[in-house]
Amino acid sequence: MKLYYIGILRPNKPEAVQLASASDLSSYSWFERSTVGQAFTFLAETVIPRTEPGQRQSVEENDYVGHAYLRSDGLGGVIITDQEYPVRVAYTLLNKVLEEYLTKHPKAEWENAKEASSKLAMPELEDYVKRYQDPHQADAIMRVQQELDETKIVLHKTIESVLARGERLDTLVDKSEALSQSSKIFFKQAKKTNSCCILM
């Protein structure tokens, strides 16, 4: 699971204006990073104008999925991940990032922006890209689900070992019953042998 890109955009026809973004291109060679980064920006700028206000959509392109959300106030966001990344976590992060951006930059600051500027930047996006690489740690519900899965595995192992121990106990009980029978037979034979000796 990999999170590659987070972008905050203002829709504009035919392409959106990217207001702030962050990406993790460490899995690409140094020579590929520029091209891949431009491709992610292009995907984000192309998807947001084609998203209806108040709607979410996920667009697959090769091995990537672009999760887009355009708020009804006109602020949009795109997260680009691999295909394994959980959709729910992507949209949860998108909501969180857009809310924080609006708190930091009211609509009046960005609604007429024609290009990205340092005063519209959001450096916290870099931290989100790093923190959300592992969606299990970043998302409380997924973390609880993972803990439940791990507990279930431990319980299964414990139950299996108890059952295995139970089977061994059953085997021991059977052996002890067989031992009891053989010891009873031995005792009777010994008694007969001893009684035979006493009569003589």
From Swiss-Prot:
Residues 198-200 form a propeptide. A lipid is attached at C196 (S-palmitoyl cysteine). Residues 140-200 form the v-SNARE coiled-coil homology domain. GO terms for cellular component: autophagosome membrane; endosome; fungal-type vacuole; Golgi apparatus; plasma membrane; SNARE complex. SUPFAM superfamilies: SNARE fusion complex, SNARE-like. InterPro entries: Longin-like_dom_sf, Longin_dom, R-SNARE_YKT6, Synaptobrevin-like, V_SNARE_CC. Signal peptide: none annotated. Belongs to the synaptobrevin family. This is Synaptobrevin homolog YKT6. It comes from Yarrowia lipolytica (strain CLIB 122 / E 150) (Yeast).
